């Protein structure tokens, strides 16, 4: 499957072994920039507890940083997805090597990431 903006969440889930909610939130943070749990809750129609739980999960996976107790920001997408892919390889005792789909995810999200931060 080729990676494009229509299937990016699905590819994030399959290649990085993250949940559907984690993929949705990661893409949201890349597109919006710094967000807090209240904003996440409103934009994704989740409870604040769910928003906080999923954001903390992305922090633990090395894709997002917590700026404050309730504010989150994505790492640069190329770094974030490679970082997660490397961790996934370690978790599954797989040799870390180039993965074109993972590289393409980072490249596709780089434009929206930059646009959200140049406001």
Which positions does each model-derived feature cover?
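Short, cationic-aromatic polyanion-contact patches
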Residues: 11-22, 36, 66-89
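Short helix-capping/hinge SLiMs at alpha-helix to coil transitions
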Residues: 16, 29-32
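Alpha-helix C-caps/helix-loop-beta hinges
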Residues: 32, 61-62
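Short acidic, hydrophobic short linear motifs in intrinsically disordered regions
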Residues: 33-43
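Short amphipathic alpha-helical interaction segments
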Residues: 45-60
């Amino acid at each position: 499957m080729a990676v494009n903006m229509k299937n990016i969440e699905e590819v994030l889930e399959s290649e990085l072994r993250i949940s559907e909610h984690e993929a949705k939130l990661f893409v949201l943070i890349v597109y919006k920039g710094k967000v807090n749990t209240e904003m996440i809750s409103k934009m994704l129609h989740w409870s604040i507890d769910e928003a906080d739980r999923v954001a903390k999960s992305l922090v633990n996976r090395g894709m997002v940083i917590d700026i404050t107790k309730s504010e989150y920001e994505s790492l640069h997408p190329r770094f974030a997805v490679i970082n997660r892919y490397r961790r996934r390889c370690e978790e599954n005792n797989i040799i870390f090597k180039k993965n074109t789909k993972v590289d393409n995810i980072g490249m596709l999200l780089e434009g929206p990431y930059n646009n959200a931060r140049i406001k």
